């Protein structure tokens, strides 16, 4: 065996030392980075809160998140799954019951009022207590503090949840009156809502009153398409993109903005106020799909809501003075991951849908053959029995019958369970990000959320 040279001998001794030094340096660098990140997060937690964004997935209980997570993983359930944007900020759970002598499960009006005002009330009530007395909302408090305010929804903008933040009425059914109040009610001589984006055009362009004209005369821009919304930069805007609610996300055309489009547009406008802003964003139609027990439609809306939520979080990360709270006002439908005594849920059929059952049913009611519609929009190998079931349902009840039959195909194929066509009473998840997020930990009441926000708006903490 050859003797090592002096240089080789030194090299053999120094290499392990160098490796240890590099490893040690890496460990210290990693530890230092972690400490820096923790310090940055701690500093953000103590930062002044200038902006509050409340995001409500109407009807979005925990099973919807579980199903959507499975879809993000292409139907698999790996040990380390891809998380939803919500999962990263799970903070606690929230009770949703109303203060109603006849019901112990809430509707969206009572739940919205509790979330907006900190006061529980009866089902159907908008911004009033159980005796019909007006109660202040967090949006109104924000405007009183000189902040800008906004409401965004995929329902009519005067529907129950947004209305609870911006109006006061003994019944959610008085939608003309609620629309009127958006124009008529003022705080310190100013309109209390600066940005209104959603559906409901028919309630603002009426024979008895043209509210769109009044908003324009008051200095608001009025837009009706995605392109006009993006082009317009005014701080006050009324955007109405459908006569009723918007089409579901899976069915929308290029002229209709997504919930993300509307959320980003609202934030861009409201953020011009140095005093800050309050914004409520609702993914309204998770609930609507759930009332129909429509898994395809519900998942389409959860995805739309997640994209809007992600945009709000991205803004908050850069701004560092924004608190984002996402939750549901209640859950709907008794949706279950698995049914019929089988320990499986299959995301693949839901992922295969290119349009909602409602959209497909409309095409069938217009005279398109069932087989052709399902082949084009369902991307499933549909059986002859399934085709016959839709044809029979369409003959009996046209569009509604066809929609129910198509929904049944997707629910059977995915093994999705539903126990109700109405709301259910279980607690809902709360997701919080930004300074003040720790205030929403654990099990809270829906009224707690409003009371915490009231304090933040008054103190910045």
Swiss-Prot record:
CDD domains per the UniProt record, alphabetical: ALP
Enzyme nomenclature, EC number: 3.1.3.1
One Pfam family, short name: Alk_phosphatase
Domain of life: Bacteria
Disulphide linkage map: none
Position of the signal peptide: 1-41
Positions bound to Zn(2+) 2: 58, 329-330
Cofactor(s) named in the record: Mg(2+); Zn(2+)
Residues binding Zn(2+) 1, per UniProt: 287, 291, 423
Entry's Gene Ontology molecular function annotations: alkaline phosphatase activity; metal ion binding
UniProt keywords, alphabetically: Hydrolase, Magnesium, Metal-binding, Phosphoprotein, Signal, Zinc
Catalytic activity annotation: a phosphate monoester + H2O = an alcohol + phosphate
Similarity remark: Belongs to the alkaline phosphatase family.
Assembly with partners or alone: Monomer.
Protein name in the entry: Alkaline phosphatase 4
Organism: Bacillus subtilis (strain 168)
């Amino acid at each position: 065996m050859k003797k090592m040279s002096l240089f080789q001998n030194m090299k053999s001794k120094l290499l392990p030392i160098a490796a240890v030094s590099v490893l040690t340096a890496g460990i210290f660098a990693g530890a230092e980075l972690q400490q820096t990140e923790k310090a940055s997060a701690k500093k953000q937690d103590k930062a002044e809160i200038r902006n509050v964004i409340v995001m409500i997935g109407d009807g979005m209980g925990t099973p919807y998140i579980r199903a959507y997570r499975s879809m993000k993983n292409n139907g698999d359930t790996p040990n380390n799954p891809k998380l939803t944007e919500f999962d990263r900020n799970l903070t606690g759970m929230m009770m949703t019951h109303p203060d109603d002598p006849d019901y112990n499960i809430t509707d969206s009006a009572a739940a919205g009022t509790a979330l907006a005002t900190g006061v529980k009330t009866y089902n159907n009530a908008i911004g009033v207590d159980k005796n019909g007395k007006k109660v202040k909302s967090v949006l109104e408090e924000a405007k009183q503090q000189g902040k800008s305010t906004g409401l965004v929804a995929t329902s009519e903008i005067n529907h129950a949840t947004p209305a609870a933040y911006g109006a006061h009425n003994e019944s959610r059914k008085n939608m003309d009156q609620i629309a009127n109040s958006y124009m008529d009610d003022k705080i310190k001589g100013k309109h209390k809502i600066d940005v209104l984006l959603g559906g409901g055009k028919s309630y603002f362009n009426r024979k008895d009153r043209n509210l769109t004209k009044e908003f324009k005369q008051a200095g608001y821009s009025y837009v009706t398409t995605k392109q006009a919304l993006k082009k317009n930069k005014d701080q006050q805007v009324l955007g109405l993109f459908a006569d009723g609610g918007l089409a579901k996300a899976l069915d929308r055309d290029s002229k209709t903005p997504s919930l993300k489009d509307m959320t980003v547009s609202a934030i861009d406008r409201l953020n011009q106020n140095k005093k800050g802003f309050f914004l409520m964003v609702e993914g309204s139609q998770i609930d609507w799909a759930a009332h129909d027990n429509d898994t395809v439609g519900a998942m389409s809306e959860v995805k739309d809501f997640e994209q809007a939520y992600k945009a709000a979080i991205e803004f908050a990360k850069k701004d560092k003075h924004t608190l984002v709270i996402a939750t549901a006002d209640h859950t709907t439908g008794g949706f279950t991951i698995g049914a019929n005594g089988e320990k499986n849920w299959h995301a693949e059929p839901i992922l295969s849908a290119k349009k909602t059952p409602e959209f497909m049913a409309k095409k069938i009611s217009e005279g398109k053959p069932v087989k052709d519609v399902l082949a084009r929009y369902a991307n499933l190998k549909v059986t002859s029995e399934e085709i016959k079931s839709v044809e029979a349902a369409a003959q009996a009840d046209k569009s509604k019958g066809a929609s129910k039959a198509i929904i049944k195909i997707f629910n059977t194929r995915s093994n999705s369970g539903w126990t109700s066509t109405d709301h259910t009473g279980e607690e809902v998840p709360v997701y919080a990000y930004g300074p003040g997020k720790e205030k929403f930990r654990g099990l809270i009441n829906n009224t707690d959320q409003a009371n915490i926000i009231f304090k933040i708006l008054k103190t910045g903490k």
